[in-house]
Amino acid sequence: MSEKIAIAISGAAGRMGRRLIALGSAEGNLKIAAAWDTPSHPDFGADSGQLAGVGSNGVPIRSITDDQTPVDVIIDFSTPAATDELIAQALKRRSALVYATTGAAAEQMEALRQAAKTIPVLWSPSMSMTVNLTMLLAQTAARALADKDADVEIIEKHHRFKADAPSGTALKFGRLIAEEMGIDGAVFGREGKTGARPHNQIGYHAVRIGDNPGEHTILFGLLGETIELTVKATNRDAYAVGALRCAEFLAGKPAGEIYTMNDVLNL
């Protein structure tokens, strides 16, 4: 696309929204055209550039239903409570949608799949490029260990403000590994007299601490040896940069199936 890609940030007043505005403002081929959040947010109405610490950009934080600014791509880092209206607005505007919110209900994911038939939609439980590369490594390990009676445990760490557990990324790791190894059992934390660990099970463990932006460790344990894959984000910019790359990728793409980070990274 020869002109700048017009971007709308949904959840613009939040921590991720501010980083998206700050980093997106520095991208030569992107333009922050709209910034949306709920009217109840204390920073509603503020200049989004000033809120993001990059100076006034003339784009105030507004409601998605009140702001009719035309945009090429919407990046959503809000909450599942906003998803239904978000999808409706994206369809109404014929805007591409990068959906980065976690914790969506099954019916909301189905609504995204239906929307993808009309507009370009990209969804990933993590916008981090290194997380998605680590998923590929985990799949490779799972495939190699599928018949070796390996135990699989997933440990994820996030900041104290994260509202869902385990993380969508941890669950995606688990789904990919389960498919490769034929595992259909799961346990979320353990306590008490649990007995011997069954092989046909993936264990999930969620840690909520401080301002940790995200860390995932995948353990494949055999008798006498263990593989440990760990991917860490050192700050939120890892997710913001990934989401902006997704927006650049999605602009101008045809509708059809939901795109993922694998498409962006050519995996």
What are these regions (language model features)?
Residues 6-67, 149-267:
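C-terminal substrate-binding/catalytic lobe of Rossmann-fold NAD(P)-dependent oxidoreductases
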Residues 10, 77-78, 100-101, 124, ...:
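Structural motif
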Residues 14-15, 81, 128:
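Residue-level detector of alpha-helix initiation sites
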Residues 65-73, 77-100, 111:
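Rossmann-fold NAD(P) dinucleotide-binding segment
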Residues 84-88, 101-123, 132, 137-139:
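Rossmann-fold NAD(P)-binding glycine/threonine-rich loop
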Residues 133-149, 165:
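Rossmann-like NAD(P)H-binding beta-loop-alpha module
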